A protein has these predicted regions:
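Short, acidic/polar N-cap/turn motifs at the starts of alpha helices
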Residues: 60, 93-95, 119-121
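C-terminal helical cap and adjacent loop that interface with cofactors, partners, or active-site loops
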Residues: 49, 115-127, 132-135, 141-272
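Predominantly a Rossmann-like dinucleotide-binding segment in NAD(P)-dependent oxidoreductases
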Residues: 1-88
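Short, solvent-exposed loop/turn segments at secondary-structure junctions
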Residues: 6-8, 68-71, 112-115, 129-130, ...
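A short catalytic or substrate-binding loop motif that flags glycine-/basic-rich loops and adjacent residues
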Residues: 42-43, 87-92, 100-101, 115-116
């Protein structure tokens, strides 16, 4: 599985540099200057961790991180200070590899410095197929695998060497559209906010709180996703050595079986 936060922040760095004691946004470039590792890991890791049932039947066990040297980061600081930046800790590109207890591998990338199209990857590679969200959405399945999913291929030579044709992909997406998107998807597009994502997440938060349900993310998610920064820094500062993940669940990572969204009643699952 792969996830990433690749977002060229060139238009925003003037706002992300400290411009006084009361500057609320100015922490970011300074923080990158002082810290190695994936310092914005939640964007890439969160959805991947949920897809792989992390602490719901599996756990992240070992991490190895590597980064490029800083070129753009140093230039950004020098441009704003007029002085030489002798050390900028965060590399222009950071890659973190994680192995889980059940033998899965996760790759997470972080790059906010170099010119690239916006990308969060979200790639899942399984034994029966492949799914990719960024930079281009696509799914790769053999004809028999697509048929087994309930969608009949309209071409004779369908195989997993390329993405599904548009007709088959649309049919697959429609058949398996998530109930949360069925309810909030169109409204989210109208309201906006990061393409509607903000609205969907806020709506789920309100729904869970109103109905006394477990939230879609819990405190263990928070700890697991955020510790990637410190563990990656520890790995790279020690020659890109393997670093063990703490078990924040204290041995309970295999109690819950699979990631699930909570609903007030079973019949509400189809509409909420």
């Amino acid at each position: 599985a792969q996830g990433a936060y690749i977002h060229n922040l060139s238009p925003f760095w003037d706002h992300y540099w400290k411009n006084g004691e009361n500057d609320k946004l100015g922490w970011r470039l300074d923080y990158n200057m002082k810290h190695r590792g994936d310092v914005y890991a939640t964007h890439g890791l969160g959805p991947v961790a949920q897809a792989l049932d992390i602490h719901r039947g599996d756990r992240m066990e070992t991490l190895v991180a590597m980064d490029t040297k800083s070129v753009v980061g140093k230039e950004l600081v020098e441009k704003r200070t007029g002085e030489e930046c002798k050390e900028f800790r965060n590399g222009d590109h950071t890659t973190t590899m994680i192995r889980t207890a059940n033998g899965k591998v996760i790759e997470i990338q972080h790059n906010v410095m170099t010119p690239q199209p916006y990308n969060r990857l979200y790639q899942l590679t399984g034994t029966k197929g492949f799914a990719n969200k960024y930079p281009v959405e696509g799914y790769a399945l053999d004809a028999d695998q697509l048929s087994a999913s309930g969608v009949q291929p309209k071409v004779d030579d369908l195989n997993s060497h390329g993405f599904l044709p548009e007709t088959e992909m649309e049919a697959l997406v429609e058949k398996y559209q998530h109930p949360i998107l069925k309810k909030y998807g169109e409204m989210a597009k109208e309201v906006g906010g990061h393409g509607g994502m903000d609205f969907v997440m806020d709506s789920r938060l309100v729904y869970c709180l109103q109905n006394g349900l477990p939230l879609d993310m819990d405190v263990y998610d928070l700890a697991e996703w955020c510790c990637l920064a410190e563990l990656g820094e520890l790995s790279m500062d020690n020659g890109c050595a393997a670093v063990a993940f703490p078990d924040f669940t204290r041995g309970e990572w295999n109690v819950v079986k699979g990631y699930k969204h909570a609903y007030a009643t079973p019949d509400r699952k189809s509409v909420v």
